Amino acid sequence: MFGKGGLGGLMKQAQQMQEKMQKMQEEIAQLEVTGESGAGLVKITINGAHNCRRIDIDPSLMEDDKEMLEDLIAAAFNDAVRRAEELQKEKMASVTAGMPLPPGMKFPF
């Protein structure tokens, strides 16, 4: 039913994948990703856990419209989150290589 290696082999493979995923999640949490908006006038750096680490606002924007600045900050944050999720997906793909998982499944479970 389970083929060569049986259920024991499948369980061992699942345990190894779980250990690799745990290590990868710890590594991802330490990574930093920077999102930008306004052609780089607003930059937001977040870590892999999506915690904001830094915000850099070009001084020229401090004289401008408050609403525009708020929009640029939101856009930079969203860009940073998108980049962090792409990086996480790439890193996790190396861990799950060879394991049949449903498409679109996000980690952690």
From Swiss-Prot:
GO cellular component terms, semicolon-separated: bacterial nucleoid; cytosol
Pfam families per UniProt: YbaB_DNA_bd
Predominant place of localization: cytoplasm
Matching SUPFAM superfamilies: YbaB-like
Molecular-function GO terms, alphabetical: DNA binding
Keyword annotations from UniProtKB, A to Z: Cytoplasm, DNA-binding
Keyword Cytoplasm annotated: yes
NCBIfam families per UniProt: DNA_YbaB_EbfC
HAMAP family attached to this UniProt entry: DNA_YbaB_EbfC
Protein name: Nucleoid-associated protein HI_0442
The organism of origin for this protein: Haemophilus influenzae (strain ATCC 51907 / DSM 11121 / KW20 / Rd)
